[in-house]
Amino acid sequence: MTESNQLNLAGVNRPIQIIPSVLPADWANMGACVKELEEAGVDRIQFDVMDGNFVPNLTFGPEMIAACRKYCNVPFETQLMVSQYNCETMLESYVNATKGANGEPGVVIAHAEANIHLHRVLGRIRDLGGSPSVALNPHTPFEMIKNIMDMVDHVLVMTVNPGFGGQAYIPTMLNKIREIRNFVIEKNLNVDIEVDGGIKAYWTISQCADAGANCFIAGSGMFAYPTLKEGCDDLRKVAQEAQKGNVLSEPQ
């Protein structure tokens, strides 16, 4: 029995959450897309915010995210893959754009690597009415954020290098997920563990769920399905089965 399965039997499983990234969506029809995602039964919708500086791509401004709100009531989250300057100067706009229709906090994820004043950024997200969360790139050790774990609602483990969709999953990130889950349990923290990158309804989501993650960001792994509902249902089923101990093996 793996260490993660021992933790599962201890009753520490958190509800599975399926969070599609709209990066591979048809941007010209984003309103219809987020509405369809809501009807598919997703738990949140993620907007990958890129500034061409921290990562080599440009994506969504706060106005576009806010414009999508009138098409659905699903909670939003923004992953700020931006430089420290852009994060701090645009933070209030993104926190507000991510909120629910009635001002409910949206998840706002700051990258540890981009923010030398991470404590200040996370505190400001909370003060502005958001749900502060932190992301770690594949090369970044968990040790870097242990001192701010009591400030966050979510930790996002990148299982690809950020910047573009459709990249290959990095399986060695499973050890980082296990390390974070053990820390969360040891310190009795109310923190969800997210994974992002190469997440599909087979061994990748299965092994991440077994390692201790409960929130799964899927882009091409969900949009490749004939319908978004089929993608959502398959992802959720495989992750839930892994929490029960039915874990899929990596193909050889």
Question: For the regions a protein language model found, what residue spans apply to each?
Answer:
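Structural motif
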Residues: 40, 71, 96-103, 128, ...
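Catalytic cores of alpha/beta
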Residues: 34, 86-97, 140-151, 198-216
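Hydrophobic faces of well-ordered beta-strands that scaffold small-molecule active sites
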Residues: 16-22, 45-47, 68, 76-80, ...
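Glycine-rich phosphate-binding active-site loops on the catalytic face of alpha/beta enzymes
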Residues: 102-108, 113-114, 156-167, 211-232
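Conserved, mostly hydrophobic/aromatic
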Residues: 30, 37, 48, 94, ...
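C-terminal helical cap(s) of enzyme catalytic domains, especially alpha/beta-barrels
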Residues: 209, 224-252
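N-terminal amphipathic alpha-helix/helix-capping segment at the start of soluble metabolic enzymes
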Residues: 1-24, 31-32, 246-252
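Active-site-adjacent beta->alpha loops and helix N-cap segments on the catalytic face
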Residues: 2-9, 27-29, 53-67, 84-91, ...
